[in-house]
């Protein structure tokens, strides 16, 4: 299945039903009074996080979603039925933005999490609502308001504990194949990995973590070179980054310069992402003698100004891989999972919808001193049904 991590959709909430103007008609009750019911509220539009989905490809073809309109009010004080809500399923890890304002509406980070993205219109009021001591036969009603319309930008950001960085052919896909059951494509040419992939590393029956493999970066990626940096967003929720360095590049390039390119592109993309905890990992050490590999790794770390330990592995032979994974697992215990999913993200403020306060103000605008509101008809009164608050 094609991996799609961005989609633009239109959501339209249902309109509110109109209020009804009706009077009680019953034998032996000549003046039954008003009995017009209210309309029903329009249906809302929700997003629902589903862990069984892993791409937004469905929304490249179906781009418009509409909730049901509320029914109109009826006589005998019958309220119209509320419009049915519309629920849109998205993968866990989806960030929702208003495409027009750029406002972040929410992050779908838990299975079955629900988020309202468009609020249905408020119901209209029937003429029963307007009866009073001076107006016992009102002919006023209100119309239902329009449902809210939003254009949304959906951005899928993978939820992983560990993210891998490196130049093309640094051995990232080989590493994820060695530590998990994931089987990304591995070949001897650059950009074998074209889309992100996830692998679950199980240390024992109770301990595990998730690793994300993204396409390699090259110099100028922040300006669109290669596959660009569009996949770096998938590392924003990771707790730790693994910087894989090919200790003996086949193309003869300088490992120090390659490492600096990755760090530079990371900083240009996001300062917060560049400040995440990182582990320096030298891969393909099996191509050199053990002592030569250790000396070269130490020299590269010194030139980079790296402070702290580094790791020497051979992903294809699984040499040193187990020790690296256990060290990562121990680090995971010091970094709570909920922090990793909110770090670098601002908690979205409460989303304001169009009709949140409409019902509070609607009746306050009614003036009872107007001559049109009494029971007696005179030349100053209008004939027929009066519709008020139409928007």
From Swiss-Prot:
Domain (Obg) ranges: 1-159
InterPro entries xref list: G_OBG, GTP-bd, GTP-bd_Obg/CgtA, GTP1-OBG_CS, GTP1_OBG_dom, GTP1_OBG_dom_sf, OBG_GTPase, P-loop_NTPase
Annotated ranges, domain OBG-type G: 160-333
Subunit structure: Monomer.
GO CC aspect terms: cytoplasm
Binding site for GTP: 166-173, 191-195, 213-216, 283-286, 314-316
NCBIfam families per the UniProt record, alphabetical: Obg_CgtA, PRK12297.1, PRK12299.1
GO terms, molecular function: GTP binding; GTPase activity; magnesium ion binding
Organism listed in the record: Photorhabdus laumondii subsp. laumondii (strain DSM 15139 / CIP 105565 / TT01) (Photorhabdus luminescens subsp. laumondii)
Assigned EC number: 3.6.5.-
Protein name as catalogued: GTPase Obg
Cofactors required: Mg(2+)
Protein origin, superkingdom: Bacteria
Family designation: Belongs to the TRAFAC class OBG-HflX-like GTPase superfamily. OBG GTPase family.
Keyword Nucleotide-binding: yes
Main localization (coarse): cytoplasm
SUPFAM superfamilies attached to this UniProt entry: Obg GTP-binding protein N-terminal domain, P-loop containing nucleoside triphosphate hydrolases
Function: An essential GTPase which binds GTP, GDP and possibly (p)ppGpp with moderate affinity, with high nucleotide exchange rates and a fairly low GTP hydrolysis rate. Plays a role in control of the cell cycle, stress response, ribosome biogenesis and in those bacteria that undergo differentiation, in morphogenesis control.
Keywords recorded for this protein, A-Z: Cytoplasm, GTP-binding, Hydrolase, Magnesium, Metal-binding, Nucleotide-binding
One BP term from GO: ribosome biogenesis
Binding annotation for Mg(2+): 173, 193
Name of the encoding gene: obg
Gene3D superfamilies: GTP1/OBG domain (2.70.210.12), P-loop containing nucleotide triphosphate hydrolases (3.40.50.300)
Subcellular location: Cytoplasm
């Amino acid at each position: 299945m094609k991996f799609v991590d961005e989609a633009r959709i239109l959501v339209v909430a249902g309109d509110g039903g109109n209020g009804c103007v009706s009077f009680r008609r019953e034998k032996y009750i000549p003046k039954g009074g008003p009995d017009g019911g209210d309309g029903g509220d329009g249906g809302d539009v929700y997003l629902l996080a589903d862990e069984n989905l892993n791409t937004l490809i469905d929304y490249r073809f179906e781009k418009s979603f509409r909730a049901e309109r509320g029914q109109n009010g009826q006589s005998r004080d019958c309220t119209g039925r509320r419009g049915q809500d519309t629920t849109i399923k998205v993968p866990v890890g989806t960030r929702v933005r208003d495409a027009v304002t750029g406002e972040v509406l929410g992050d779908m980070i838990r299975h079955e999490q629900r988020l309202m993205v468009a609020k249905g219109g408020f119901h209209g009021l029937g003429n029963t609502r307007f009866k009073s001591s001076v107006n016992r036969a009102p002919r006023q009603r209100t119309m239902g308001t329009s449902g809210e319309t939003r254009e949304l930008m959906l951005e899928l950001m993978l939820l992983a504990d560990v993210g891998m960085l490196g130049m093309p052919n640094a051995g990232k896909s080989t590493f994820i194949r060695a530590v998990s059951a994931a089987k990304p494509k591995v070949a001897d040419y650059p950009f074998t990995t074209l889309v992100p992939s996830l692998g679950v590393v199980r240390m024992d029956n109770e301990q595990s973590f998730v690793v994300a493999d993204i396409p390699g970066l090259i110099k100028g990626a922040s300006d669109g070179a290669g596959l660009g940096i569009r996949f770096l967003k998938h590392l924003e929720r990771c707790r730790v980054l693994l910087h894989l360095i090919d200790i003996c590049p086949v193309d003869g390039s300088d490992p120090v310069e390659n490492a600096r390119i990755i760090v530079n592109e990371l900083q240009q993309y996001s300062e917060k992402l560049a400040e995440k905890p990182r582990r320096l990992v030298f891969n393909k050490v099996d191509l050199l003698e053990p002592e030569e590999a250790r000396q070269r790794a130490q020299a590269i770390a010194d030139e980079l100004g790296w402070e702290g330990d580094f790791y020497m592995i051979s992903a294809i032979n699984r040499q040193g891989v187990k020790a690296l994974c256990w060290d990562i697992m121990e680090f995971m215990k010091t970094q709570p999972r909920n922090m990793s999913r909110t770090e670098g993200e601002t908690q979205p403020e409460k989303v304001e919808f169009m009709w949140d306060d409409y019902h509070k103000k609607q009746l306050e605008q009614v003036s009872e001193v107007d001559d049109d509101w009494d029971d007696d008809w005179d030349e100053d009164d209008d004939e027929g049904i009066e519709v008020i608050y139409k928007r």
